[in-house]
Amino acid sequence: MVKDFRANGFLFRNLIGRFLVWREEKAYRRLKGLKGTPTLYRVVDGLVLVLEHIPGMSLEDAGDKGTVPEGFFDALKMLVDAFHRRGICHCDLKRAANILVGADGRPNVLDWSAAILEREFRFFPLTGIYRRFLIDDLNAVTKYRLRHSPETVSVEALERYLGRSRLEKMIRALRDRLRELLQRVA
C-alpha cells in the first residue's frame, strides 16, 4: 500500500504531509514486528510511505455484513494492550476505517499518523494527556464491542466508556473541527 502526499497542494504537501509522514514513520518503527500492524517498507522523499498490504475489510464493512469473527474484539483488545506496552498510543481508533478484519479474521490497526509516543509526553502535565489517549484507545474497543457484541462488554469497560469528562468532550469537539479544516485544505 502506498500513502502519497506528492499530489497535494504545495503548502499542505510540504507542511502537513511531511509532518504526517514523519509521525507515521516514527510510529511504524516503534511497532516493527508487531503482528496486527502493517510493516513499513520505506519512505520516499519524506512524502510517501510504502507499507505492507494486508488483505481484509474494514471493521465497518465486516460489521455491516455480519462477518466480524467471534473473539475478534478480545484479539483487538490484546493488540491495543501490546502497542500500549511499546509506549505508543494510536489516538484515532474511533474511526472504523482504521481497524481491518484481516483475511485470517485477526484485527489489524492501520493509519498511525495521529499516534503519539509515551516518551513525547513524559513530563507533567503531558503525562495526564497521554493517559487520557490510552483510555481513548481502550474506549474505542468498547465502542465497537457495544455495536457488534454488547454481551462481551465488561462492567469496568462500560463504566470507563460512559465516564467522559467535560474536558474530554471539549477536546473531542476541537479535534473534530480541526480534522474538518484539514480535510478542506487537502
Regions found by a protein language model. Give the residues of each.
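Conserved hydrophobic/aromatic residues on the N-lobe beta-strands of protein kinase domains
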Residues: 1, 48-51
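Residue-level recognition of conserved beta-strand positions in structured domain cores
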Residues: 4-6, 42, 52-53, 111-112
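Short helix/strand-bridging catalytic loops that position acidic/His residues to coordinate divalent metals
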Residues: 11-15, 63-68, 122-130
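Short beta-strand micro-motifs within the conserved protein kinase catalytic domain, predominantly
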Residues: 38-49
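C-lobe/activation-segment region of protein kinase-like
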Residues: 102-186
